[in-house]
Swiss-Prot record:
This is Protein YABBY 4. It comes from Oryza sativa subsp. japonica. It is found in: Nucleus. A zinc finger (C4-type) spans 30-57. The keyword Zinc applies. Keywords: Differentiation, Metal-binding, Nucleus, Zinc, Zinc-finger.
């Protein structure tokens, strides 16, 4: 029990005949050809679901008239348009024209496009968020290990070369002992004067260089620069000099 009629997206309402008192005029939107259909529904079927055939594209539409008459809290299907009570009344054609101008198909298409764009944006943002940790973490670089030294390596390998200690010569030993002997006999003498006197004693005793024995020694006087009394050389001097000469001979020192 349904009737259908087709019209263009914008149609004059003057050509529409006023419905009979036993029918209710309803307007249904065809989502296939984007056409608004004016349907006359009997009053006995206002709260039923009727089938409407589009006169423009012959598409069958299932229309719930209860949703058209009473606004429901849930959103209506895409193929139905909600009109106020003034639109359902056949005596207010101008109000219907105003509502149709606002509820154009282009507005519906924009709403659908915005919904699809928001869903695509949400999916892309979630995929970017899931890929963000992988992009932020750079690949780990291999750690270069330094070659380990063997544990049993000798410690002397890293030790700097030691300086070889030279054995003091017979001359150095004689000068050292002679300076100590001169300072013991004359404590007031300076180190420079004692060294000069020790060097003169070494030069004035050629028998020391030849390694003569202490029993062949002789006495010699020494006159210091400060005019002090002559110091008599003792037998201990010859013994020390002889020992120094013997050590020098053992080291291969040639006599003068």
């Amino acid at each position: 029990m349904s009737s259908s009629s087709s019209s263009s997206a914008v149609f004059p309402l003057d050509h529409l005949a006023a419905p009979s008192p036993t029918e209710q005029l309803c307007y249904v939107h065809c989502n296939c050809c984007d056409t608004i259909l004016a349907v006359g529904v009997p009053c006995s079927s206002l709260f039923k679901t009727v089938t409407v055939r589009c006169g423009h594209c012959a598409n069958l539409l299932s229309v719930n008239l209860r949703g058209l008459l009473l606004p429901a809290p849930a959103p209506a299907p895409a193929n139905q348009l909600h009109f106020g009570p003034s639109l359902l009344s056949p005596t207010s054609p101008h109000g219907l024209l105003d509502e149709v101008a606002f509820q154009t198909p282009s507005l519906l298409m924009e709403q659908a496009a915005s919904a699809s764009l928001s869903s695509i944006t949400g999916r892309s943002s979630s995929s970017c968020a899931s890929n963000a940790p992988a992009m932020q973490m750079p690949p780990a670089k291999p750690v270069q290990q330094e070659p380990e030294l063997p544990k049993n390596a000798p410690a002397s390998a890293n030790r700097p070369p030691e300086k070889r200690q030279r054995v003091p010569s017979a001359y150095n030993r004689f000068i050292k002992d002679e300076i100590q002997r001169i300072k013991a006999g004359n404590p007031d003498i300076s180190h420079r004067e004692a060294f000069s006197a020790a060097a003169k004693n070494w030069a004035h005793f050629p028998h020391i260089h030849f390694g003569l024995m202490p029993d062949q020694g002789f006495k010699k006087t020494f006159k210091p620069q400060d005019g002090s009394e002559d110091i008599l050389l003792k037998d201990s001097l010859y013994a020390a000099a002889a020992a120094a000469a013997a050590a020098a001979a053992n080291m291969g020192v040639t006599p003068f």
